[in-house]
């Protein structure tokens, strides 16, 4: 077992009840272009086209053969593009239940599948996009070979769903999906199942080729970047792949039914949610519809993903992200506070002892307010308190801010994704957002070396 001692469990109100309910019915779903790092789409549909679930919507020009398939049947109502015609979303109005079927196998056959059989089904169904690489967090090329594959079956993000609750609903499908993963490279590459040390994820009998790694401690103990760092670290010449536990369920369903499984069980939670709980919805769900009559009055920000590293869901991207397993809702913090810096701050939280809210175990109604403007980095040891990885965070963040990619690479930035620096952003006295800085550095390193 690996114990994470440095980090932070955010004391945020609105913790979800770990019981699954049916969410609001949604009649719109979307694929979000921003989810796929570096992807350039070659569109296979137009507005007004009627599509089946599992039909190809677009292909990656930079990664030929990697296709992105419709999460529902219906009509393509809008293809949203932003600046420089960057794809924002492909929106489908859900109609009917027509779907494309793929090759199915008996459960007893899964352990003897060839790598080619597994790969073909994943590619044709679009489930190849469940994999992401580290470094760079991109959908892997079809000819890429990783050092290992990580399955993340734990989540320490604030307000997250408990994977154990979800996996009890799909125990057989999860096991089938894990078996399929062991066959992707004919059993030649290790598959690591990372779980909470206290969780009772059903894996009996043991699956050949699956190695279980247990983690405990504070967030980011549940991030895949943490798992990779301690189990099979990556570098400039070494790549691993990872995917989440609900995509493993979908893979198991695909191979045993021949159908694309697009259900998602997510956490709908946060200070502004009336009844925080786990809800059953679908991949790419319209979040305005999903959260209708679920939120407290006022101006709210709906986030696809975690409050620490998720994306604001509004306008053309008002949809559940491909990799998001939670929807978080905060009040917009637009109110100005006169002399707030000299107040005791019993209703505020800080990792430093500058406010009364630091003491005790109270949960706080966090808002989107950052309580200050962006300014220079202030190295007071805050980053070191929340960074459990074997890197020097202050120096790394300085290099990212300065655009020094050579030094940043030497300090370990290739191991990281935006979510791995989210706590550094949260505790930064200078209110700097290090996620975009990291992404800019990674893009430059990938392009220039």
Curated annotation (Swiss-Prot):
Q: Which residues cross the membrane?
A: none
Entry's InterPro entries? NqrA (IPR008703), NQRA_2nd (IPR056148), NqrA_C_domain (IPR022615), NQRA_N (IPR056147)
- Give the record's GO biological process terms: sodium ion transport
Please list the GO terms describing molecular function.
oxidoreductase activity, acting on NAD(P)H, quinone or similar compound as acceptor
Catalysed reactions, as listed in the record: a ubiquinone + n Na(+)(in) + NADH + H(+) = a ubiquinol + n Na(+)(out) + NAD(+)
Q: What class of enzyme is it?
A: translocase
Q: Which UniProt keywords apply?
A: Ion transport, NAD, Sodium, Sodium transport, Translocase, Transport, Ubiquinone
Which Gene3D superfamilies does UniProt cross-reference here? 2.40.50.100
Write the Enzyme Commission number(s) for this entry: 7.2.1.1
Family label: Belongs to the NqrA family.
Function summary: NQR complex catalyzes the reduction of ubiquinone-1 to ubiquinol by two successive reactions, coupled with the transport of Na(+) ions from the cytoplasm to the periplasm. NqrA to NqrE are probably involved in the second step, the conversion of ubisemiquinone to ubiquinol.
| Subunit structure, as described in the record | Composed of six subunits; NqrA, NqrB, NqrC, NqrD, NqrE and NqrF.
Q: Which NCBIfam families match?
A: nqrA (TIGR01936), PRK05352.1-2 (NF003759)
Q: What is this protein called?
A: Na(+)-translocating NADH-quinone reductase subunit A
Which organism does this sequence originate in?
Actinobacillus pleuropneumoniae serotype 5b (strain L20)
């Amino acid at each position: 077992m690996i114990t994470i001692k440095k980090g932070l469990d955010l004391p945020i109100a609105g913790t979800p009840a770990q019981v699954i309910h049916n969410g609001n019915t949604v009649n719109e779903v979307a694929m979000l272009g921003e989810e796929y790092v570096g992807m350039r789409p070659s569109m296979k549909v137009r507005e007004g086209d009627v599509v089946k679930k599992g039909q190809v919507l677009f292909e990656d020009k930079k990664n030929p053969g990697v296709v992105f398939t419709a999460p529902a049947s219906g009509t393509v109502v809008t293809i949203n593009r932003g600046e420089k015609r960057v794809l924002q979303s492909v929106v489908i109005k859900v109609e009917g239940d027509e779907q494309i079927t793929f090759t199915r196998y008996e459960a007893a056959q899964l352990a003897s599948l060839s790598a080619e059989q597994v790969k073909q089904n994943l590619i044709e169904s679009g489930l190849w996009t469940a994999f992401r690489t580290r470094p760079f967090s991109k959908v892997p090329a079809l000819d890429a070979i990783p050092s290992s594959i990580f399955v993340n079956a734990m989540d320490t993000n604030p307000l997250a769903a408990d994977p154990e609750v979800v996996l009890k609903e799909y125990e057989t499908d999860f096991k089938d999906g894990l078996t399929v993963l062991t066959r992707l490279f004919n059993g030649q590459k290790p598959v690591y199942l990372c779980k909470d040390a206290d969780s009772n994820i059903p894996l009996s009998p043991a699956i050949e080729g699956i190695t279980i790694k247990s983690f405990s401690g504070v967030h980011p103990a549940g991030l895949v970047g943490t798992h990779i760092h301690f189990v099979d670290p990556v570098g400039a010449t070494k790549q691993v792949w990872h995917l989440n536990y609900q995509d493993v369920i979908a893979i198991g369903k695909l191979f045993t039914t021949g159908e694309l499984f697009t259900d998602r069980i997510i956490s709908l939670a946060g200070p502004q949610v009336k009844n925080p709980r786990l809800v059953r919805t679908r991949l790419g769900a319209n979040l305005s519809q999903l959260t209708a009559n679920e939120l407290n009055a006022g101006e709210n920000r709906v986030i696809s993903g975690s409050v620490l590293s998720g994306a604001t869901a509004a306008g053309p991207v008002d949809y559940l992200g491909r990799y998001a397993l939670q929807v978080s809702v905060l009040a917009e913090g637009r109110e100005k506070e006169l002399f707030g810096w000299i107040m005791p701050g019993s209703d505020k939280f800080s990792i430093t002892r500058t406010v009364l809210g630091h003491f005790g175990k109270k949960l706080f109604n966090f808002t989107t307010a950052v309580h200050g403007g962006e300014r220079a980095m202030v190295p007071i040891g805050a980053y070191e308190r929340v960074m459990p990885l074997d890197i020097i965070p202050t120096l790394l963040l300085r290099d990212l801010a300065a655009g020094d990619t050579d030094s940043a690479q030497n300090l370990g930035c290739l191991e990281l994704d935006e979510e791995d620096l989210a706590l550094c952003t949260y505790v930064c006295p200078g209110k700097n957002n290090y996620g975009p800085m990291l992404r800019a550095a990674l893009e430059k390193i990938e392009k220039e070396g």
